[in-house]
Amino acid sequence: MTVATNVNAAGVDREVATQELNRELQDKGFLLTSTEDIINWARTGSLHWMTFGLACCAVEMMHTAMPRYDMERFGTAPRASPRQSDLMIVAGTLTNKMAPALRKVYDQMPEPRYVISMGSCANGGGYYHYSYSVVRGCDRIVPVDVYVPGCPPTAEALLYGIMQLQRKIRRTGTIVR
């Protein structure tokens, strides 16, 4: 009797009601979820990344794809074309001459697209911050989702940045309403 009253009561938290229903249906082999949750789950487990390696950080990025760290176990796969990738990893010093090329490649990526800025130079100019030819952070050219600090950052730091991006995708969602 009280269960029926609580379900119809005004102000009941939908999340709690959904969790209770999930527990009941789980015993019978069913799962209750939304389409958006399924899409976000699939998107976090299938990031296709493209490198924009500009300097020393690109070497550390290559380490993450090798057998010791094996980035693919986190559900990421390298792609050579921006039209096939949804994650761009900017690694290294971005110069004023290279900035239009970075923006052009970013614009060729399909939506939703994500950017990881890897290393001090990509994050804010790094050692060359005061040079006339260096962009002081790739976030002045493209929107950045995750910053990975270091000079150069370790392969573990990049893997942690990818896991943070996956967490962000799960948390924020990707469907535009």
Swiss-Prot record:
Reaction it catalyzes: a quinone + NADH + 5 H(+)(in) = a quinol + NAD(+) + 4 H(+)(out)
Location(s) in or outside the cell: Cell inner membrane
Cofactor(s) for this UniProt protein: [4Fe-4S] cluster
Enzyme Commission number(s) of this protein: 7.1.1.-
Entry keyword annotation includes Nucleotidyltransferase: no
InterPro entries with a match to the protein in the record: NADH_UbQ_OxRdtase-like_20kDa, NADH_UQ_OxRdtase_20Kd_su
Main location class: membrane
Family per record: Belongs to the complex I 20 kDa subunit family.
Name of the protein: NADH-quinone oxidoreductase subunit B
Species per Swiss-Prot/TrEMBL record: Roseobacter denitrificans (strain ATCC 33942 / OCh 114)
